[in-house]
């Protein structure tokens, strides 16, 4: 194949046409078609609006530029042998509909940019532009992405954090910034926290659902590329200033953003700087429950009984501050050589207090006849805070400090007909939790409870005798301080080469490249327990305390109760040996500490060729070699380290792929793809650690023998684009997955050396057998401009995704194969919809986002499986343009007060229920020097 391709590569040193296509205000237009129709030579502009036409015959040529929603431009240039001609084109908005010229409003221009890119891609992709992101009230990239077909998100404290693409869990997808991978600040997995990045910082979101050979292969669900802003053709300053309120805490939200862009030195240097600040003081009302299937009778024998064995009532108060800065430079050395410098820094602080009431060791009591006559257990109250006495930044709260810094230098060079592109990226992600403190008081075993299980979605416990839970009845149990730190460093490099090809007057290119990805990850935590040397902490009445119960607890009729205040806990001088005796507790952290190093070498060969004026093929193969080494800790008991265990893996994957694109008409496109992808195990899953927890009767092990998950994928998609800006599409997908990874759970594990003959619970990540995932997507978006008068201002945005999956190879605790389990993350139904109205000044939009419930984590049996419950979010936003440069906007999120809910086994058994309430924002957007 290689020699056949090289035989038809055109080496004639004719000429080259290069340039940039911009809109009327100087912003690059991505996805524009640039073509010399008489020669069938053409190209699409990149994300910044740049294009290159190679191997152009000498002489006078007419170059046509087309873009959805914009008038076609035709330019005449003279091409000389071996020379590069620069052609910059500025398009004007307007499209001929019948005999009427429709001029796009500002709100539709962003949609036009996204649809043009999507239309001209060789692979199946969804693209959302910055202007379109701004049409929804989404503060971070995660919330913006849940509007895209086939994507659902898992939330944290009411914000979208982890991405699920086409029913595949976060670790089966990849996330990039400007085409380069970014490291993860998560301690034990590869997930990228999408709520770390404000949506204002992004110019374009690309979701590649069928990857091409020149992309990293570890993207079974999809590869997400976040493209930051590029410099416009002239000076531009835009920004946002807003404030709002969260109804759970009734505290303000502050948001600000600023973008500056310009070109200097006769347009040879471009600069764009973006900054964003968001300060959100919020919280959540939470209950959590663990359900049991058996209990002990009066004789100590097990019998079947479904009940809550442990339950928490939790009150969270969180202040989340996001700061992001991005600076991008481009240097046009000459018409054939450009250097880019791209940087981005994201920093998020979460300050959190949590008040946690726990009912535990719950068990039935029996009368003389052996019938249940009541319930008893133990009650605990715990405060979470931070050691402000040693670090002012923690502010009496637990501080989670997450930062991601990435910088890329890349070059684009043209030597005759040879394109040479290269890049080098260095990136660092870190998460630090300094001086995290917990203090716990308890009311001991045998406390009688009233247990209300009439509604299993809202189980509740109360003390039979209220005097038993008075403040003075809670005695000191535990006081701890811990420090957590996770760091990941990435060093990535690539070289890509491409040459034009011609077959029977149909153009194409052959492309080859080499890729290196190096990664270093480590987690270094510690944990200390402190005992007071005096009696001044003996019971809760002796210390500063406060009742944090509230009348309108959103999770149900619960009272969280009285706790030690975080201010008191924060100022305890735990390191003073005259006041406290400290002891390190290795069992709480040592097994979780590890080091991992990963090196991935990749190469590819790819041919992208027009076979006719309607049919194009992209075919190629990618080869990736993975080498991983890691060090983990084997812990014998709660205090002793046996040894450090080392391990390594080395494997190679060969991953061919074919993409077909058929342009039935100028606006109707059919795509099909066969691809092969993989997902590497989470780092911590590979670490050969052992964690023995006698108090909990649990044994947890890593698995150095895990194989990577591989998938063969088939996709088909049909798209019809409307000239008046819109799209209707339908497609289907099928994935044959091997060696998927799940957590094996044995609830009756016995090991004479470890458990002493008792039955413990054993956890270990293992490879399953095979899985099949399939589904379908439909999407429709259009401004209803064909309607008369007032009605033409309405617009519709809708998409629906169906997914289903089956698995083979998941075993229960008895070693039996389970046949009733879907892949975690497979939500059967996803729906997005919005109805909007806009005229020259006013825009109003109401939107919904719905995700059906799905398996989130496989347990030891169907009874223990954890499900992520269905969710439906309703948001409304509106804006009014005072001038072309100034717009007022109003946003309302989560108007239905949609909670986060997990359930255990069946929907009636609540496992976690967490409410956040609605939030509102109002502000101004400005765009200065807009032409």
Give the residues covered by each predicted segment.
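Transmembrane beta-barrel wall of Gram-negative outer-membrane proteins
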Residues: 250-363, 405-407, 656-658
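Gram-negative outer-membrane beta-barrel transporters
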Residues: 734-736, 755-854, 896
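Short acidic/polar hinge/loop motifs at secondary-structure boundaries
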Residues: 54-55, 181-209
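C-terminal beta-signal and adjacent terminal beta-strands/loops
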Residues: 794, 850-858, 876-931
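Outer-membrane beta-barrel signature, preferentially recognizing the C-terminal barrel domain
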Residues: 389-406, 588, 592-599, 649, ...
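Short, acidic, small-residue-rich periplasmic hinge/interaction motif at the N-terminus
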Residues: 22-27, 32-37, 66-70, 80, ...
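Extracytoplasmic beta-strand/coil segments of soluble accessory domains associated
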Residues: 142-181
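N-terminal periplasmic accessory domains that precede
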Residues: 85-89, 141-144, 161-164, 176, ...
């Amino acid at each position: 194949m290689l020699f056949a391709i090289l035989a038809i590569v055109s080496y004639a040193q004719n000429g080259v046409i290069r340039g940039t296509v911009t809109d009327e205000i100087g912003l690059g237009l991505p996805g524009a078609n640039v073509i010399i129709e008489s020669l069938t030579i053409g190209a699409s502009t990149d994300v910044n609006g740049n294009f290159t036409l190679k191997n152009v015959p000498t002489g006078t040529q007419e170059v046509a530029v087309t873009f959805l929603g914009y008038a076609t431009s035709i330019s005449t240039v003279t091409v000389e042998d071996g020379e590069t001609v620069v052609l910059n084109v500025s398009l004007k908005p307007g499209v001929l509909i019948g005999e009427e010229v429709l001029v796009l409003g500002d709100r539709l221009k962003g949609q036009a940019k996204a649809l043009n890119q999507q239309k001209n891609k060789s692979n199946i992709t969804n693209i959302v532009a910055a202007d379109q992101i701004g049409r929804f009230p989404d503060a971070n990239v995660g919330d913006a992405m849940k509007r895209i077909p086939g994507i659902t998100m898992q939330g944290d404290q009411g914000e979208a954090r982890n991405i699920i693409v086409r029913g595949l869990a976060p670790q089966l997808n990849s996330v990039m910034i400007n085409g380069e991978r970014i490291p993860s600040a998560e301690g034990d997995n590869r997930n990228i926290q999408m709520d770390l990045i404000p949506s204002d910082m992004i110019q374009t979101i690309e979701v590649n659902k069928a990857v091409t050979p020149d992309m990293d292969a570890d993207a079974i669900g999809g590869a997400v590329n976040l493209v930051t802003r590029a410099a416009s053709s002239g000076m531009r300053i835009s920004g946002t200033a807003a404030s709002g309120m969260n109804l759970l805490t009734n505290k303000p939200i502050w948001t600000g953003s600023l973008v500056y862009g310009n070109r200097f030195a006769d347009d040879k240097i471009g600069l764009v700087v973006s900054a964003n600040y968001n300060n959100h003081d919020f919280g959540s009302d939470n209950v959590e429950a663990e359900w049991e299937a058996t209990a002990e009778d009066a004789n100590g024998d097990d019998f079947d009984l479904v009940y809550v064995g442990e339950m928490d009532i939790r009150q969270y108060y969180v202040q989340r501050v996001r700061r992001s800065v991005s600076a991008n430079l481009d240097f046009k050395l000459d018409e054939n050589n450009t250097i880019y410098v791209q940087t981005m820094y994201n920093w998020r602080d979460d300050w959190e207090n949590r008040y946690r009431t726990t009912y535990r060791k719950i068990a039935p009591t029996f009368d003389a006849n052996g019938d249940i006559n009541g319930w008893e257990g133990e009650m605990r109250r715990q405060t979470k805070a931070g050691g402000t006495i040693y670090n002012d930044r923690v502010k009496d709260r637990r501080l989670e400090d997450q930062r991601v810094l990435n910088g890329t230098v890349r070059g684009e060079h043209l030597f005759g007909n040879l394109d040479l592109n290269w890049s080098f990226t260095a990136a660092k992600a870190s998460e630090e939790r300094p001086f995290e403190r917990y203090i716990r008081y308890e009311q001991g075993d045998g406390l009688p409870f009233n247990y209300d299980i009439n509604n299993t979605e809202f189980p509740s416990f109360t003390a039979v005798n209220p005097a038993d839970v008075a403040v003075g009845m809670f005695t000191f149990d535990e006081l701890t301080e811990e420090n957590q730190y996770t760091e990941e460093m990435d060093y990535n490099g690539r070289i890509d080469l491409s040459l034009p090809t011609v077959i029977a007057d149909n153009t194409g290119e052959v492309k080859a490249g080499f890729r290196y990805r190096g990664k270093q990850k480590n987690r270094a935590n510690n944990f200390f327990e402190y005992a007071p040397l005096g009696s001044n902490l003996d019971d809760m009445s002796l210390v500063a305390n406060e009742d944090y119960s509230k009348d309108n607890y959103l999770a149900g009729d619960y009272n969280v109760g009285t706790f030690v205040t975080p201010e008191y806990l924060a100022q305890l001088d735990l390191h003073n040996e005259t006041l406290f005796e400290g002891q390190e507790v290795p069992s709480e952290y040592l097994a979780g500490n590890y080091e991992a190093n990963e090196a991935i070498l990749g190469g590819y060969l790819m041919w992208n060729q027009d076979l006719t004026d309607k049919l194009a093929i992209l075919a190629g193969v990618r080869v990736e070699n993975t080498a991983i080494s890691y060090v983990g800790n084997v812990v014998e008991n709660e205090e002793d380290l046996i040894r450090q265990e080392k391990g390594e893996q080395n494997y190679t994957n060969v991953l061919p792929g074919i993409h077909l694109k058929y342009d039935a008409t100028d606006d109707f496109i059919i795509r099909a793809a066969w691809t092969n992808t993989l997902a590497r195990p989470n780092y911590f899953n590979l670490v050969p650690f052992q964690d023995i927890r006698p108090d909990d009767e649990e044994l947890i092990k890593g698995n150095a023998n895990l194989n990577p998950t591989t998938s063969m994928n088939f996709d088909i998609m049909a798209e019809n684009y409307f000239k008046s800006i819109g799209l209707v599409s339908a497609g289907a997908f099928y994935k044959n997955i091997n060696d998927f990874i799940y957590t094996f759970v044995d609830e009756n594990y016995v090991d004479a050396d470890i458990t002493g003959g008792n039955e413990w619970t054993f956890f270990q990540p293992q490879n399953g057998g095979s899985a099949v995932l399939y589904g379908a997507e439909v999407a429709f978006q259009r401004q209803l401009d064909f309607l008369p008068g007032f009605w033409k201002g309405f617009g519709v945005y809708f998409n629906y995704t169906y997914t289903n999956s089956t698995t083979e190879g998941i075993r229960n605790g008895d070693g039996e194969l389970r046949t009733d389990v879907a892949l975690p993350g497979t939500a059967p139904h996803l729906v997005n919809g919005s109805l909007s109205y806009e005229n020259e000044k006013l825009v109003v939009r109401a939107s919904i986002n719905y995700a059906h419930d799905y398996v989130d984590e496989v347990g030891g049996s169907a009874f223990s499986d954890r499900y992520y419950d269905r969710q439906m979010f309703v948001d409304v936003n509106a804006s009014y343009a005072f001038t072309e440069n100034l717009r007022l906007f109003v946003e309302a999120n989560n108007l239905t007060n949609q909670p986060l809910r997990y359930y255990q086994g069946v929907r009636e058994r609540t496992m976690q229920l967490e409410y956040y309430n609605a939030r509102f924002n109002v502000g101004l957007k400005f765009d200065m020097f807009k032409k």
